[in-house]
A protein has these predicted regions:
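Charged/polar low-complexity intrinsically disordered segments, enriched in acidic residues
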Residues: 87-126
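Catalytic core of non-heme Fe(II) oxygenases with the double-stranded beta-helix
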Residues: 1-91, 96-97
């Protein structure tokens, strides 16, 4: 069994519908329990194949093309869910993610003045772009 290439539906839920911005896959059993079954995500610069330890999770943009390769033996157990972000636009979420990574790298190098400037930029972009 596998799951063909697709992007996730833009809206999830029943009566309380929400926008699916981020997809979540939680691996409930380990890679040794089955053959195949990799989560394959098209990153735009190639395909990333993911098969993680039990209890591990992967988050990825819900609009990313992805599939699950065929399970050839054993059983693949996962839980999937979706998250609505306060930042609707995936490009803006990527910018914020890059800023957080840069901020954390600056913090590791103990540069408090530059850290504060990057943190201020992050906070102000959140203020501009976030939706409750």
């Amino acid at each position: 069994m596998g799951y063909g290439t697709h992007i996730d539906d833009p809206l999830m839920g029943g009566a309380s519908r929400y926008r699916s911005d981020v997809s979540v896959t939680v691996f409930l059993n380990g890679p040794a329990d089955y053959e195949g079954g990799e989560l394959c995500i098209d990153t735009g610069s190639g395909e990333t194949r993911i098969k993680l330890a039990a209890g591990s999770a992967v988050l990825y943009p819900a609009n990313a093309r992805h599939s699950v390769s065929e399970v050839t033996s054993g059983e693949r157990l996962v839980a999937v869910s979706w998250v609505q972000s306060m930042i609707r636009d995936a490009g803006k979420r990527r910018i914020l993610s890059d800023l957080v990574q840069a901020r954390d790298a600056i913090d590791r190098h103990r540069d408090p003045q530059t850290y504060s400037r990057v943190e201020d930029a992050y906070v102000n972009l959140m203020r501009m772009w976030a939706e409750p």
